[in-house]
Amino acid sequence: MNYIVTHPGSAHKDDFLACSVLAAEFAIPIYRRDPTEAEIEDPSVFVVDVGGSHDPERLNFDHHQFSSDHPPTCSLSLVFRYLGVYDDAVRFCPWMKTAEWLDARGARQTAEWMKVDPFVVAQLSSPIDFSLLRYFAEEQELSIHHPIGALMARIGGDLLNYLRSLRRNLNELSNCVEFWKIADLEICYLPKIEGMSADLSSALTMFVREQDRDIAGTVSPDKRGSGFGMTRFNDDRRLNFTQIEHEADVHFAHKQGFIAKTSASDPERLKHLLAQSQVL
């Protein structure tokens, strides 16, 4: 892939992020100008958010030609689909659908979709967004060595790394977690695994959210110690870990009852502590 062409003038979050992701993936420069007809036809040039065409084989990723009743779509949606991470982006990035709505429908319709006052959408805006988009819009050419181009590549790389590593971790978790029945509660347990990365434990909440099960809590290796952490899932009040705060092998129990840390590692002992934590 040779380079990216996107429109000149004001920039929006979707074209900024779409270009960031492509710059990270292919280490190529960005040109902010109208594309030529030759570039639109060239399968080695990414044409993003301009050009009136969505044709992944020719690397065309514009959405402005879609009909008014087309599902909200932005240039980032199209680039994510091209890279095979769109479904996970929608699933695991809560801001993704909002970004699509804002770009395709505007703030007022987005507010109606979110069931909030339009002013709330403005309240969620960030001065970081404003400055980055302005700096991006001021440039005509950005290589990955340009200060803004380098930052964009870092942002795009972070996005792709998050989505791809999360998918790997979720696939791995499906092969190693256990589901315990503690009285009438179901608990998701992640055992210690040799060489396990901290990211695997961090993905446990996402994994549980994907399950069609009534999970009350999780048990996973403590990132800061040798024992385990026990946590309510979705703040499930059927568990209250203050009920085990005086146990000798429990060195921390939050006063709000949603988490506890224990030096215990034997599964039977962990199950016993969970049973003691159940609110009857």
Where would I find each of the regions flagged by the language model?
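Short coil/turn segments at beta-strand junctions that form active-site/ligand-binding loops
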Residues: M1-Y3, D42-F46, D55-R58, D184-L185
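Short, hydrophobic/aliphatic alpha-helical segments
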Residues: M1-I4, Q243-E245
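Conserved beta-strand termini and adjacent loop/short-helix elements that scaffold enzyme active sites
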Residues: R33-P35, H63, S220
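N-terminal ordered "arm"
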Residues: V5-V45, G52
